[in-house]
């Protein structure tokens, strides 16, 4: 009888040690990578690391895999139909790639039970099945960071509770935090985002950005009944690096370029006023670029499934109308016919500039001077017509 009791005690002891050893051997971590210099890397990256020392496994699960070689990649990206997929790589390769590009990597070890770790592995393996690994990417709502957060929450038996995020932040505010020093990239993104991107968002929506998830995870807790434990056991920087500061690769900022355009437009207007002749090449360039940019924005507003782009008030300034009307304008001028385009454009652009402060959208700093540039160009034509006809009339006929 005593031998049986001793045997049972030893059995339970070794079973406990086995389970404890199994738990100690498995470690799951949230990996947050610092921003890189390429536009697709400006916001950083998130991945999951799964370590099982007993099996010699050390894998990184990455929901941010995509290929530029995908057929019609640019068109699909603009339309909001880009597909990303879950990729798996060995940790040393993952660490080395970020060290090579100069991006620091932070590791937050998750405070999970053995059953939760096993469930997380099962979910990741299920996600990695060929029929499950590909997903439709959404920059704000379904990306590599939100996917990592969601799969962590799914494996936890209780509930993850986050602290409140920063008040008053919008998607555009967070984007601007990551585009500092990259003014041309910031301009391109700003031109695409509409007024919806300027609405305040809650803590959960702020987690689309990798470092916002990192900060949220630090303060998060796991609640199971009356039990509360921190989500993160500990954090460390596994790659300490600084990216090469390459900036935009262009010496002039967008704002400087727009002011140069204003200067050239004023000079062209002076030449036209002095010679009483229209310099058409400048009109073709200025209104052509306005129309082409307008085609892109109109396409985004009407056809793209990207979030926040459908409410873009910038379409009032940048639309295809100048590009469509430009040939008509030139033909009417050559035939000596009257044309009200520039007169209407002066009134229209004046009204646009006046309503800008009241529109619930944060325009890029280049928008106002750009509108002024286009206004000056049209005003030059109106003044030239007045000079040519020597009377107070806001119609013009070209020579």
Segment roles from a protein language model:
Residues 126-394:
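Activation targets extended, charge/polar-rich intrinsically disordered C-terminal tails
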Residues 24-103:
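Glycine-rich catalytic cores of cysteine/serine-nucleophile enzymes that process amide/ester linkages
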């Amino acid at each position: 009888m005593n031998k049986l009791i001793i045997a049972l005690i030893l059995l339970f002891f070794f079973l406990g040690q086995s389970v404890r050893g199994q738990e100690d051997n498995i470690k799951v971590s949230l990996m947050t990578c610092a921003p890189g210099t390429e536009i697709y890397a400006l916001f950083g990256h998130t991945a999951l690391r799964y370590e099982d020392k007993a099996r010699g496994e050390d894998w990184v699960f990455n929901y941010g895999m995509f290929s530029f070689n995908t057929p019609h990649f640019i068109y699909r990206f603009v339309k909001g139909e880009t597909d990303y997929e879950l990729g798996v790589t060995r940790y040393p390769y993952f660490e080395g790639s970020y060290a090579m590009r100069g991006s620091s990597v932070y590791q937050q070890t998750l405070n999970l039970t053995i059953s939760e770790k096993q469930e997380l592995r099962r979910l990741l393996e299920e996600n990695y099945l060929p029929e499950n690994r590909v997903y439709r990417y959404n920059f704000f709502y379904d990306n590599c960071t939100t996917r990592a957060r969601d799969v962590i929450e799914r494996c936890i038996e209780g509930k993850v509770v986050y602290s409140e995020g920063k008040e008053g932040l919008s998607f555009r505010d967070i984007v601007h935090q990551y585009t500092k020093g990259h003014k041309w990239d910031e301009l391109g993104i700003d031109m695409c985002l509409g007024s919806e991107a300027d609405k305040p968002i809650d803590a959960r929506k702020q987690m689309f950005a990798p470092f916002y998830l990192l900060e949220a995870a630090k303060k998060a807790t796991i609640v199971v009944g009356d039990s509360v434990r921190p989500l993160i056991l500990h954090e460390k920087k596994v790659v300490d690096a600084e990216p090469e500061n390459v900036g935009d690769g262009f010496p002039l900022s967008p704002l400087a370029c727009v002011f140069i355009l204003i200067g050239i437009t004023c000079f062209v207007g002076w030449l036209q006023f002095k010679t009483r002749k229209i310099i058409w090449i400048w009109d073709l360039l200025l209104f052509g670029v306005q129309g082409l940019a307008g085609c892109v924005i109109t396409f985004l507003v009407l056809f793209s499934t990207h979030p926040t782009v459908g409410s873009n008030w910038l379409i009032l300034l940048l639309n295809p109308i100048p590009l469509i009307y430009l040939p008509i304008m030139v033909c009417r001028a050559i035939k000596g016919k009257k044309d009200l385009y520039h007169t209407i454009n002066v009134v229209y652009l004046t009204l646009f500039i006046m309503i800008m402060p009241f529109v619930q959208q944060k325009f890029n700093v280049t928008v106002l001077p750009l509108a002024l540039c286009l206004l000056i160009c049209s005003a030059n034509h109106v003044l030239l017509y007045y000079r040519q006809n020597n009377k107070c009339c806001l119609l013009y006929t070209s020579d």
